[in-house]
């Protein structure tokens, strides 16, 4: 049991004033009546196997919304839809890489304003459950940890007591994140009731490091105080729970549809004989991967499973309630058992779609929750109107070669990784010369390319290498003195398991007919840095740029579309790139993410209303492989009102 009482640097207790719906909620000094002080508290009642909130039995029904997958302008809308479904809490993970993309540079404003997200939830009457990591998985690049850990320490053992890892983790959590969270804890007047440490750590089984997890526990207790409820989550498998359990931290489980909740909770009871039953990840859908079919879960099955969990008086978090989007190039990848990258969309077949619309799951879920918790009165959320902004004519404005020519080049005898070149995501152009006479054809071997490479010899297209397809060799025709160029794309670092030290680029030496190639010039192309993007010359007399390849690949294309001035505000819309192959899209210099309709299942990209403006807007594509029209004819893309996430796939 957690102790009750006052604490804090100023020695006062705090209490949440009861406010009307939608009103700002702030921390206030506790009021004293006849020498009685009301102290806000949230704790575990082990004797009666329940949570207590201010001394009263409590169970949470929460939904996962990742603030970094939703633009800040839409946080109130998504959280309101969660509350109107009867949920009383929101769960979110906190991504280290979002807030410290470069070592020592911290971002906590705008779309990264974590504290504002938490306060918005509080204003809407939602409690908050935080998952602080430092590893979060969530199908994010490197599981949400920053790439520069690999840059600084190539041999670092992530998620362990490796001193290098602990040093950076301690600074991030102990000096930056946790002090920001403390004032938002429930006992301090905020909405944060629980904090999760790590994520499914037990799935590593024999790789688990108890010194690390105890260190994480102690650091969190030191910075947040002794009374905050800490918890872990693991698969309901004995080995996973045994390895993931941290002494003094409450162990919860996660499972989706098709599982018997009674049997699953028996697993939790093996490690928590007393305390609340808690499924902290009840899956509403599942993740997608490029080239594999789109995952869905039947709404009736999902609702019945939720009902069965709640009937046991368990607490539950629905993962995801609203999935959102991995904007930019932040999506991760997995080994299944071969490499597979996650798409830009994180729709997850959730009750609220990527664009913020209630799906066919919303009302059945709401009906189930209403049996156990009061559902707020008010209008039931409805789908919003979408923009049909039509065809966008796109003209080639620069080749990748032109853009790269303005960027610095690094020379080294051996090929360097993205991390060694201080590049998080994007492209690296590797070039070397053939120093000797070779047979015709010769075999160029690029073992362990991470992840996809476009090969050129003497300026001519010579083929492709692919980690996903296990294609690491190319037969080339070259003469002594020819330049070999390889453009390597990162498709997202592995987000789970023992392979998250996922270096990108040419990660081992390249050979030509068995001879190691030396002397490399390398140009890092940081596609998330808008300052490197080419400007569009809007003069109608401007001639299209020469494409980077004869097929129109490795080329930037730009065009404009109009949002009518008479519209009160822009509308959500979806970018369709029929005929285009693979690349990256920006609207008004905001990076929507990767597109790859050739392999599916994601065909369209979500374009949020808040990045648009009335009048002219710019669409920019970097096509990596082939455009749907021969130069110099203009190509086109379309902005439509339908999202397509279940397109055809090769397998």
Q: Which positions does each model-derived feature cover?
A:
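Cleavable N-terminal signal peptides of Sec/SRP-targeted secreted and luminal proteins
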Residues: 5-27
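Aromatic- and glycine-enriched glycan-recognition loops and surfaces
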Residues: 66-84, 103-123, 211, 438-444, ...
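Carbohydrate-binding surfaces of carbohydrate-active enzymes
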Residues: 166-181, 188-197, 202-204, 209-213, ...
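Gly/Pro-rich turn-and-neighbor structural signature
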Residues: 189-274
